[in-house]
């Protein structure tokens, strides 16, 4: 069995790290939105799961319980959409990167 080329593996790891840093920067710019109550409450989050904006229709402000429920629902929808978007971006960036199973095979593991 041939010995793995550690220089090539280190280069691949460095490239993968740089690529993932780029993805993290891109995720900050991507925005997902969630809404609840037919649009009475809207939330926007970025791809890093940070809440950017929350808007509430002033007409529903008298019903605190409903506002709270709608805020939670809108934020959760936005976070779910953001998580899916982030996962897609990471998978796109990971194309061709080091596969852990391949590393195991190089070292005689099961992979």
UniProtKB/Swiss-Prot annotation:
Q: Does the keyword 4Fe-4S apply?
A: no
Q: Name one GO molecular function term.
A: DNA binding
Answer whether the UniProt record assigns the keyword Membrane to this protein: no
Record text on subunit structure and interactions: Homodimer.
Know the name of this protein? Nucleoid-associated protein Cpar_0834
Query: Any idea what job this protein has?
Result: Binds to DNA and alters its conformation. May be involved in regulation of gene expression, nucleoid organization and DNA protection.
Similarity section: Belongs to the YbaB/EbfC family.
- Subcellular location, principal: cytoplasm
- Fetch the InterPro entries from UniProt: YbaB-like_sf (IPR036894), YbaB/EbfC (IPR004401)
Q: Where in the cell is it found?
A: Cytoplasm, Nucleoid
Q: Name one GO cellular component term.
A: bacterial nucleoid
Coiled coil location: none
Keywords for the protein's UniProt record, in alphabetical order:
Cytoplasm, DNA-binding
